[in-house]
Amino acid sequence: MQTEFVMAVCDVYVKWKQGDPPRYRCYVNDELFTERSWIWREQYLEEYIPIQAGPGHYTIRYELVEPEHARIKVHNLRVDTGPAIIDREGRVQIYTPERTE
């Protein structure tokens, strides 16, 4: 199966009141993409998610490691590079582009 490179982007914001910075995880389908500590206050970050995969639908999901201490917001999922769109369910849909020879 031929794979395509796609760069998905979304805006991420985490809010917490006190204590250590919260940690969050990002998954593509059910595969862990990254786990990070959120160290910024009052700031959205653009998170770039590289995907090298075959045609299909890919769900990008964020979760807090300890959800009782913070809230996470993810907005504006979009495709920056590659043959993909965001479908009606909010998933990245990779397609095979037509090749001219």
Task: Locate the predicted segments by residue.
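Beta-strand-rich recognition domains
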Residues: 1-28, 34, 47, 53-101
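Aromatic sugar-binding surface patches on proteins
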Residues: 41-48
